[in-house]
Amino acid sequence: MDKKEYCYYCFEVVAATLEHRKVRDKWNAKSWTRSIPLFVKFASGKGHDKQLRGCIGTFRARPLVTNLTYFSKQAAFCDERFRPISLGELALLECQIDLLVDFEPIDDPLDWEVGIHGVSIKFTANGIRYSSTYLPSVAAEQRWDQEETLESLIHKAGYYGSIRSLQITATRYKSLEIGCTYEEYLHNLELLG
């Protein structure tokens, strides 16, 4: 099976939602019962001009079809950082799925490699719990080192106080990235009839 089918399916879910119709399961998605954590991301543009349009996922392993269906809608319509994706912009989009694997708790929140690992942090400050994560591609795309990434993660979590005394719990992980364009999705639909 071509793993790009996962991306085709995400585009189908978003298109069906925007067109107020049922999802066509051309890929037998109901058979995708393997449980795995994942993130779904939509972006517009190409290369260095690529702009994120939505990215939401989970560390909770649930059946693949369940996570893909739910998080394709969440990334397209519910990421509060962006306006919801519209029908008119679908043709400009790429979909990327990150299947998350190889989770490892780490003692030092800087013990991971840029471009290889994603990192998830958790900490408590003033009685409030904070957490955030970056997928493996983020630090490399931003050209951050581990320290810059950690500082950004702390701010992403919503904490802006002193970071010197924070007791951070960190986990590193890897991802299997799969991507396709909307054009590839349409071409695949055409091939499947």
From Swiss-Prot:
InterPro entries per record: AMMECR1, AMMECR1_dom_sf, AMMECR1_domain, AMMECR1_N
Membrane-spanning parts: none
Entries under Gene3D superfamilies matching the protein: Hypothetical protein ph0010, domain 1
Domain AMMECR1: 1-189
Pfam family, one: AMMECR1
PROSITE patterns: AMMECR1 (PS51112)
GO cellular component: cytosol; nucleus
Source domain of life: Eukaryota
PANTHER family associated with the record: AMME SYNDROME CANDIDATE GENE 1 PROTEIN, AMMECR1 HOMOLOG
Protein name per Swiss-Prot or TrEMBL: Uncharacterized protein C688.03c
